[in-house]
C-alpha cells in the first residue's frame, strides 16, 4: 500500500508531516509513503498581515482541493490553522499526541524573561491574540507586526532590531532548534498567555470514504490530545472565531474531568474576556460551546 501525503512546503510543515509518517511506520512498516508539497495562498502572500487577507483556512484550501480530487490520500496540518467549517467530503481522523501548547518569547541574549525587558521594548508578532495578551501583562511594550516562517521571524530580531519575537513552542520543539538558537527562550505560561485553540496539535485530514486510512491512523491516536482538540475547537466554533479577533483556549485534563479556559477579545483589543468552565471529560465538546456562550455574553 502507498499513501500520498499532502503538506505545505515550509521546513516546519515537512517536519510535522514526516513525524506523522514515522509514527505510522512504527506500526505499519510495510506501507510506502510519498510526500506531495502543495503551495497555499497563505504561503504565497507573505507581505500582508494574516487578518487582512482572509480567514482561517489560508494555509489549507489548496490542500483540501487535492484531497477531494484524490490527488493525495491524506494531509497533515497544524490544527490551529484549520477553519471550524470543513468541506462536506472531508473529516479529521484520529489526533496524535500534542506537542507543547505554550507560546514562547525568543529574546535578545541580554534578557532572560518578559519582566527583564526594558520599557517600550519592541516585540514582534503578527497575531492579535499574542499582541493583546502581551499588552495586558505589560502595556508599555511596543508590538511590531511580523510574518513569515519560524526561521524568518527569528531572523527579524536582528534585522528589525527587536528585543524579541513570539512563536509557538511546538514549532521550536518540532524543528529541534531550541539548543541551536543564539537567543534566550522564555516560555509564556497560560496565566500570561492562553494559546490558540488546538495549538501544538496536528490535524490529519482525510476523505470520509477512506475507512482503510482511519484504521491505520487509529494506531497513533492520543486520547487526551483528542479531548483537548474537541473542547478547544468547540469554543472556537462557538465564538465564531477567525483571524480577526483575539481568541485563546486551553483544556486541562485531570483524571475524568476537564477544565477549559477561554479568551475572547474585541478586534481592537479594547476589551478582553477570559473565563474558565469545568466538567466531566465526556462533556468536553458541550463545555466548549457553553464557555463560548458565557464569554460572548460578557463581551457584548
Curated annotation (Swiss-Prot):
For this protein, the record's Pfam families field holds: Porphobil_deam, Porphobil_deamC
Cofactor(s), by name: dipyrromethane
| Reactions catalysed according to its record | 4 porphobilinogen + H2O = hydroxymethylbilane + 4 NH4(+)
Q: Which EC numbers does the record give? A: 2.5.1.61
Give the EC class as a word: transferase
Q: Which GO terms describe its molecular function?
A: hydroxymethylbilane synthase activity
Pathway(s) served: Porphyrin-containing compound metabolism; protoporphyrin-IX biosynthesis; coproporphyrinogen-III from 5-aminolevulinate: step 2/4
Q: Which SUPFAM superfamilies match?
A: Periplasmic binding protein-like II (SSF53850), Porphobilinogen deaminase (hydroxymethylbilane synthase), C-terminal domain (SSF54782)
Q: Which domain of life is it from?
A: Bacteria
Gene3D superfamilies named in the record: Periplasmic binding protein-like II, Porphobilinogen deaminase, C-terminal domain
What keywords is this UniProt entry annotated with? Porphyrin biosynthesis, Transferase
Residues annotated as carrying S-(dipyrrolylmethanemethyl)cysteine in the record are: 243
Any binding details for the cofactor? Answer: Binds 1 dipyrromethane group covalently.
Q: Name one GO cellular component term.
A: cytoplasm
Function statement? Tetrapolymerization of the monopyrrole PBG into the hydroxymethylbilane pre-uroporphyrinogen in several discrete steps.
The miscellaneous annotation reads:
The porphobilinogen subunits are added to the dipyrromethane group.
Q: Which PANTHER family match?
A: PORPHOBILINOGEN DEAMINASE (PTHR11557:SF0)
UniProt lists the family membership as follows: Belongs to the HMBS family.
**Assembly description:** Monomer.
* Protein's recorded name: Porphobilinogen deaminase
- Species source reads Clostridium novyi (strain NT)
Q: What is the lineage of its organism?
A: Bacteria, Bacillati, Bacillota, Clostridia, Eubacteriales
